[in-house]
Amino acid sequence: SEIYDSHGYGNPDISAIRNFIAQEYHEGKQLKNVLLLGKGTFDYKKKLGGRPNLIPIYTSRSSLDPLTTYSSDDYFGLVDWGLGNWEEDATGDATLRIGIGRIPAISYVEAKNWLEKTIAYEKQELVFPSSSLTFLADDGDNGVHMRDSEVHAALMKEAHPFFKHHKLYLDRYEQINVGGAQESPEAKKAVVERISQGTLLLNYVGHGNETTLMAEEVVQAQDLQNWPQQTQLPLWFTATCEFGRHDSPFLRSAAEELLLASDKGAIGLLATG
């Protein structure tokens, strides 16, 4: 409320938060990263109910088209002098000057669990086999997801040759027909085993939605409750659709569940929303 009072005339406006961050950036000359602690949704006026909009999130002006609409915290990092509207145009887009992250907690307990999880992670030593990298890839689409994963793995091997690689490609595992849909219990088991044994990073390329990776449901948000406690929490990178969505007042995405789960899941995610 203090930020809204000083930079937004008392109104809960995302520009008030952005302008406060910009002031700190330009006056202090030291600000490099900002972490937002609290859920944000597209329900600015709190008309729909559901989860609270604790720290609002930027929503694109084209908010009704399912292919062009998006929400993003990047807006808070656009702090150049004279910058007003976000043009939302790749050809003339503004530059992020600081890193922006968000912990979409909706309660004190969730925030506390995340903090304890992070402190425990930072105290851990980087040891093998935990210091391995895992590459998870979908099938279909003429093998493009596997090819992309191979490119990522090659780049990491060149830059960091001391890491061991684990490649979990869906085409390697048997699929079965269940009720007219394809599933792969073998691939699902392989993912859980790899995460349980420890991996520093998990990189996924393929199809997905808010709660699931792959049409074969190899990773689902609802499975997380059955995962064992993990000794090494991975950083997740997911090149897919909506897995990291966190602007809904009703649905909690798999990325949110992974981040806020106690003693399991993910230490952080770079995901698409």
Roles of regions detected by a PLM:
Residues S1-G273:
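Cysteine-dependent hydrolase recognition
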